[in-house]
Amino acid sequence: MTFPVSPGVPPVHRAESPINTVVPELGSDPSWDRKDLGVLLSVAPGEDGAFYSPHSDANMHGTLYGGQLVGQAMMAAAEANRGSAPVHCVQVNFLTAGKPGVPMRYEVRQLMRGLNFSVQQVLGTQGTRTVISANVSFHRGEPAPEFSSAMPEGVPPPEELRSLRQVLIDCADLLPPLPTLVKDRLGNTRSVELRPVDAERFLFERNRKQARFRYWARVLEPIAPQAQALQQAALGYLSDYWFPLTALEPLVGTKLGTGLYIASLNHSVWFHRPVNPNEWLLFDATSPCTANARGLSTATVYSRSGDVVASLAQESLFRGWTQDAEGGFMAPGLPEPSAENGQA
């Protein structure tokens, strides 16, 4: 695969305006079958030394899904690092919305290389727009004592839980009016599977005292055990999937169709042990605070055997609240779908 030479690293560019649409174009690049993350997350070297991907995975706002950007940035960094060590930390800033159908260009610059650690900086761009900035750190690993927090007690195994898609089908009468395109795609990804714990409570009830969301997730298309970089990038892809909604639990009842514009601002993943995303992983997510329209979500990721394999943190933007006469806030909700605009 050959890509044209692009001059230099483009300057950071602000988004022209906030993207508040909730009626997106949900298409993805036809060269990706929406199943194989090995295709979606792959990057190819260009003649200019950067890495490129033509593949797109659109979110519900019609922009590039953040997990795709995290995973592709990790793969670009791993290619530049030549597989000398696994990733131990990824720190990302999402700078502007990515546009589906426009190739991503990843410029990688080595910040540090030591005997056991190295750090690669990745800038992901579309033309003059900088979409993502990431620092990806690698560590060879060293022998040392280990400790893990215990897996939460009382969590049902994934085999006893319904998929997110099935929960939404079973609870269709609880869903607010949604555009048909959005309703058809909710929880209907073919690349990963998510099975929430206590799904109805989280999706449709408000807990004013704490924010907690537990769910099992895995990749559906097998990834070869020797493809360590891709396995880690696949967890990067998974790490943004439904995770930001954790911070909404104390604020709203129904988490779907709020009418809010939700966007990832920054995102971090720490890899503690080798991870196999083909197997079920338990995400135990909480949120300590939401303020100034920003919510922080954190999570511990457990393997099926109970080991802590990763930790996550993400700050998200929740924009569009309406304020009543008493100073309280509520989500605006979605407009009623109409046959005239093809959403019924």
Predicted regions span which residues?
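Terminal targeting signals and extreme-terminal segments of soluble enzymes
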Residues: 2-344
